[in-house]
Amino acid sequence: MDSIFFGKLNIEVAAASGIEAVVKRELVRLGYEPSGANLGRIEFEGTFEDVLRANVFLRSANRVRIVLAKFKAETFDELFDGIFSMRWQDVLTRDARIIVDAKSVKSKLFALSAVQSVVKKAIISKLSTVYNGTFDESGAPYCIEAAIVDDVVTVTLDTSGEGLHKRGYRTYLGEAPIRETLAAAMIQLSVWNPERVLIDPFCGSGTIPVEASLIGLDIAPGMNRNFACEQFANAPKVREKVQDEAEQRIKRDRQLRISGFDINKDAIKLALKHAERAGVKDNIHFQVQDMRDLSSKYAHGVIITNPPYGERLMKEDELKALYRDFGRVTAKLDEWCVYAITSYRGFEKYFGRRADKVRKLYNSELECNFYQYLASPPPKRDGQTR
């Protein structure tokens, strides 16, 4: 029996709708040649070390999987046969704890519990013939996904475990938190770079300033957590090598100008805790401040924020007034770029300006718009990028 983890692998990166291109650019910067960037999935070829690198370094991706097989199945018999034909002995250890997940889109096989049952039965049947006996599934978990789209089954093995938004620094949640992966994507969709000023006037528990600091200092988001693939007994041990690479990339001496403000003092306390846990507390200025008091000594800068929205946080009349005030305050910062994400469809009307660009993004399952207001770039200083 040969383990697949010592050869070339087809690796799939899952991303939220709307940010596939961001993840693709991240993969290119890591040295890979990804193919496609749609339907929330991007693929590239690599080794098991590349699987772990993707988990450690990707900022905007949801998770990383290994593609095991693709085949057409319109009946449960075809599904069983396709799964049974695979060399599961090269993927799973004899004591593997097998977990099966399923998804179905525009396919004849749409009963997910039945799909899960058939897939698990086929895997067990195959391994029983190989090992000539039973097994207790007492080892490391191996999560298999059967995703059926247009009657084509893609079988993958999850390597991440918990979603990649779980960085390890955010243990306390404020009101209406934004996912770390989405915050990182918003920053990368903006014109901000480490040479520029960044302010989040509704910073809440600090996710956007923290993610910007991680980007600015080149700190890998997955440095301080573990991944499911590290438990695979039949895979090479490469964490130390990847961790060393991540350590060497860090630019601790880089000076950043990142600020987070919020009217809620408890939110600022959370933000400080999260920044400390992320190792970037000294790189962010947090302060209790009403958005209406926002000003800056800098003529040029970037505002990236997740303002309040939704009935749970405030009444609609209060929301409209808040957005009006936000528009008035930022209008005074006329050489600043403004990026705001909200699910409220009337944002542009009450903000007082039509956005230069609007992009549909999802905060967890909530559909939002990412409004982008651009400005002229700052004068370029010697050796400085804009």
Task: Give residue spans per PLM region.
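SAM-dependent Rossmann-like transferase core, predominantly class I methyltransferases
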Residues: 155-189
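Glycine/charge-rich, flexible interdomain linkers and switch-proximal surface loops
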Residues: 136-150
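Non-catalytic nucleic-acid substrate-recognition regions in nucleic-acid-modifying enzymes
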Residues: 2-140, 386
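Short, charged/polar, Gly/Pro-enriched secondary-structure boundary elements
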Residues: 49-56, 162-165, 379-381
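C-terminal catalytic and target-recognition region of SAM-dependent MTase-like enzymes
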Residues: 287-293, 297-386
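A short, flexible beta-alpha/helix-coil linker loop
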Residues: 105-108, 163, 308-312
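Conserved S-adenosyl-L-methionine
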Residues: 178-295, 311-312, 316-318
